[in-house]
């Protein structure tokens, strides 16, 4: 992985292969809380680099993204970091000739939700793992109007034994909805224009499922039998180009 700089921040970049159906595509992976580009690459076991596309690993300020939750007691919120603007400029800097995909885990997943609302059309499809939509009173973006919403294919993956972000919803830096309510919310916004798919995994914790899945007692059960990267690859392959 090459470490590069955009603006005042580092990011990791792994170029895709010279040939193949996804050679012109780019995946922007947003890490979870306290992670860096290097840490999140290990945490995902580099699985998304097997999709045959380039992968970029940007870093949040103080290892957090200023996501859309109203309650976020982290330095990036204290500083008023504008990650919507930063990530929009970051994505456009690549001048991608293929499709642009966004994916995030936990805090990174919440940042994806914010981008879907405040930077509509930035991604051609998105993936969120281990994060559910905040409750309305805990969500900073204003409800989207029809002319401000861009239907975006969305794959949601959530562990049924996640101790950090419960699948039934609860309090995770403020109120959060269930995984099912999250899927229903985005289906209402997308209508028939773009699919929303929810995959729930039994005996799976706050992890990125896949071979070599990294976990701990704090994060809950690992899942090496389901490959989140492969699921996303199958999801985007079903989309019309």
Q: What annotation goes with each model-predicted range?
A:
Residues 155-157, 175-177, 184-241:
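C-terminal catalytic histidine-bearing segment of alpha/beta-hydrolase fold enzymes
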Residues 28, 56, 101, 127, ...:
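Hydrophobic/aromatic beta-strand patches that form the interior of the parallel beta-sheet core
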Residues 59-63, 132, 204:
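Short beta-to-alpha linker loops that shape the active-site pocket of alpha/beta-hydrolase fold enzymes
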Residues 114-124, 134:
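Conserved hydrolase catalytic core segment
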Residues 125-194, 203:
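The feature captures the conserved acid-bearing segment of alpha/beta-hydrolase catalytic domains
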Residues 73-78, 164-177, 216-224:
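Active-site rim elements
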Residues 104-106:
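Conserved alpha/beta-hydrolase "nucleophile elbow" surrounding the catalytic nucleophile
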Residues 4-101, 110-114, 118, 209-218:
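Serine-hydrolase catalytic machinery in alpha/beta-hydrolase-like enzymes
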